[in-house]
């Protein structure tokens, strides 16, 4: 085939016009070394350039030796960094179990796509740039384009999947996270790759058979069906602009929702701090109050007295019915705590129970103290509604098992003068006073016959109060940790999206410009823009390391060959955790 012009095509879009061969003055070579289109006919049938007198073209494609060295060195370094970085991501996912989360499964898929680009696409495109022609044949050309487009589109699809996953995790934490499993993540990743393959591979590989001929000239490599500017424009919109728009909107929604949750958590922490500083002992008809520290001091001053009064301590199940029905429902299983502020009715009236029924919060416990000359009530710290309070299922399952044991142990403790049981009873516990039993018999009748009797000191009452505050702090801590994880995931997503937009936008802008002006953009800009798209695969592992400490430490461990040391540290850590667990187990049973 003979050409008499100086137009060529980009490997991505065939309608790009630019200089295929440099002139001698541009290349800095002596005249006659490089073939010029204006004076020579170029035969590309065998992949060689020849002039009428039989001289062959420069094998460097019109570049100087130093230009070739610079291009090969720069692109080779980028390809090597891309390969090493994404291999580190894959190996890190394999060796570190902490990285095997649903979020990181999507990053693993993205790393696989980037690795393909680093191994195949970057090197073949560098060869194309240096030689200024495609010398590997039509089959290799079609395979390169198919792999390149499938991997690039899979990267975009994976970014979309990550964005939707983050969005639903933030906006629908209860419904979506229950369905968010590794199996479902694998299905979504598989769909991303299948869709990318179906969209591009058959059309690139078999288009010449669909239309009956191959229109790509020898020595060139581009997608045959992208020969029209309108088709090129449409593919750019579908492959880049639409996904970027969707991802930007989703990330904005994620950012707003995260900010909203941050404010809610700050309010919850503030209310928890206020609850800790509140006075929780209120004498009837008096403004006197005392803190847990004061209770301890009183307990120390009365060390010669074993029993200070009457204390009611119980955990009950979910109930919004009057107090008479609450006692019946105390023996049923449930998944939440009860609003048992109605214990105040033991000292006041039944009307207070009805007022507490409609309250928005629920208490863990209520303690009623009867001291000589005083009538005091210890009200527990309020917790959020039971719909928002998560109680471990194993604790709920212990209710029926411990019910009989609690009764027997409580009765034995009274007879033998034993200490408080190791675990708080799930039943109402009524504590008899050694000071004034007769005066408090009316309270006993209001609690019911199912209660047991045990001595309880002020110190134990203080521990009960601390238990309630600790429970609240644990809830806040879990919410805070969850929010921190969501923020880290959002930061990783933002870094990946930002890198994607920065590296892909220049090339796709040139695509739009080329639709209206096919000779306005030099070939050098096209090559730089296309290579910039590849650099996105180089930057992604850096984003993982910068935004995720676990990735960063695992990368460091692998690069420094500290795998054995890591295993030893892990074993030592597990041993320490085991010791800590065995030490805390008896304390948690109290």
UniProtKB/Swiss-Prot annotation:
Compartment(s): Cell membrane; Postsynaptic cell membrane; Basolateral cell membrane; Endoplasmic reticulum membrane
Gene Ontology CC terms: basal plasma membrane; basolateral plasma membrane; dendrite; endoplasmic reticulum membrane; plasma membrane; postsynaptic membrane; synapse
Q: Mind telling me which residue stretches traverse the membrane in this protein?
A: 68-91, 105-130, 143-164, 185-206, 230-252, 492-514, 527-546
User: Which coarse location class describes where this protein primarily resides?
Assistant: membrane
For this protein, the record's InterPro entries field holds: GPCR_Rhodpsn, GPCR_Rhodpsn_7TM, Musac_Ach_M3_rcpt, Musac_Ach_rcpt
The outcome of changing residue 281 to L is: No effect on basolateral sorting
Where along the chain is composition biased (Low complexity)? 334-345
Q: What is the effect of changing residue 276 to A?
A: Loss of basolateral sorting
For the Cytoplasmic compartment, the record's topological domain ranges are: 92-104, 165-184, 253-491, 547-590
Q: Where is this region: Disordered?
A: 323-357
Q: Which GO terms describe its molecular function?
A: acetylcholine binding; G protein-coupled acetylcholine receptor activity; phosphatidylinositol-4,5-bisphosphate phospholipase C activity; signaling receptor activity
Question: Its biological function?
Answer: The muscarinic acetylcholine receptor mediates various cellular responses, including inhibition of adenylate cyclase, breakdown of phosphoinositides and modulation of potassium channels through the action of G proteins. Primary transducing effect is Pi turnover.
- Membership in a protein family: Belongs to the G-protein coupled receptor 1 family. Muscarinic acetylcholine receptor subfamily. CHRM3 sub-subfamily.
The associated disease is: Prune belly syndrome: A syndrome characterized by thin abdominal musculature with overlying lax skin, cryptorchism, megacystis with disorganized detrusor muscle, and urinary tract abnormalities.
- What protein name is recorded for this chain? Muscarinic acetylcholine receptor M3
């Amino acid at each position: 085939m003979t050409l008499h012009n100086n137009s060529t095509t980009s490997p991505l879009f065939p309608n790009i016009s630019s200089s295929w061969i440099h002139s001698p003055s541009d290349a800095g070579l002596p005249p006659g070394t490089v073939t010029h289109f204006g004076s020579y006919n170029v035969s590309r049938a065998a992949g060689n350039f020849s002039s009428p007198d039989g001289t062959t073209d420069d094998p460097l494609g019109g570049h100087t030796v130093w230009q070739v060295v610079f291009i090969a060195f720069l692109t080779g370094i980028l390809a090597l960094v891309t390969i090493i970085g994404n291999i580190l991501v894959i190996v890190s996912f394999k060796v570190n179990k902490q990285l095997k989360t649903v979020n990181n499964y999507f990053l693993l898929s993205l790393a696989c796509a980037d690795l393909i680009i680093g191994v195949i696409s970057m090197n073949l495109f560098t060869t194309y740039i240096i030689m200024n022609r495609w010398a590997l044949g039509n089959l290799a050309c079609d395979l390169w384009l198919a792999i390149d487009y499938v991997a690039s589109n899979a990267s975009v699809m994976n970014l979309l999947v990550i964005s939707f996953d983050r969005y639903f995790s933030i906006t629908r934490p209860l419904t979506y996270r229950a369905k968010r499993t590794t199996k479902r993540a694998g299905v979504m990743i598989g769909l991303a790759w299948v869709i990318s393959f179906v969209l591009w591979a058959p059309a690139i590989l078999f288009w010449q058979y669909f239309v009956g001929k191959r229109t790509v000239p020898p020595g060139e490599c581009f997608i045959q069906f992208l020969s029209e500017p309108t088709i090129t424009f449409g593919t750019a919109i579908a492959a880049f602009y639409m996904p970027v728009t969707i991802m930007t909107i989703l990330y904005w929604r994620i950012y707003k929702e995260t900010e909203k949750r941050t404010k809610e958590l700050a309010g919850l922490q503030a209310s928890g701090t206020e609850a800790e500083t509140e006075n929780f002992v209120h004498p009837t008809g008096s403004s006197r109050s005392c803190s847990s520290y004061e209770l301890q001091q009183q307990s120390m001053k009365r060390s010669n007295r074993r029993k200070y009064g009457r204390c009611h301590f119980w955990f009950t199940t979910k109930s919004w019915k009057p107090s008479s029905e609450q006692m019946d429902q105390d023996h049923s299983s449930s998944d939440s705590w009860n609003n048992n502020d109605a214990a105040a009715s033991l000292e006041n009236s039944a009307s207070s129970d009805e007022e507490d029924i409609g309250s928005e919060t629920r208490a863990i416990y209520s303690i009623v103290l009867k001291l000589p000359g005083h009538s005091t009530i210890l009200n527990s710290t309020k917790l959020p509604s039971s719909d928002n309070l998560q109680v471990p299922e194993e604790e709920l399952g212990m209710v029926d098992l411990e019910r009989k044991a609690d009764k027997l142990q409580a009765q034995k403790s009274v007879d033998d003068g034993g200490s408080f049981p190791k675990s708080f009873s799930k039943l109402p516990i009524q504590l008899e006073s050694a000071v004034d039993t007769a005066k408090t018999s009316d309270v006993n009748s209001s609690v019911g016959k199912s209660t047991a009797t045990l001595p309880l000191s002020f110190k134990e009452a203080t521990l009960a109060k601390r238990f309630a505050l600790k429970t609240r702090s644990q809830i806040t801590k879990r919410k805070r940790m969850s929010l921190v994880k969501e923020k880290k995931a959002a930061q990783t997503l933002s870094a990946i999206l930002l890198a994607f937009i920065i590296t892909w936008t220049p090339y796709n802008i040139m695509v739009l410009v080329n639709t209206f002006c096919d000779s306005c953009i030099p070939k050098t800009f096209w090559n730089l823009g296309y290579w910039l798209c590849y650099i996105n695969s180089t930057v992604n592992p850096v984003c993982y390391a910068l935004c995720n400490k676990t990735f960063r430490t695992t990368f460091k461990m692998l690069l420094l060959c500290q795998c054995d040391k890591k295993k030893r540290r892990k074993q030592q850590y597990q041993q320490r955790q085991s010791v800590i667990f065995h030490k805390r187990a008896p304390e948690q049973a109290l």
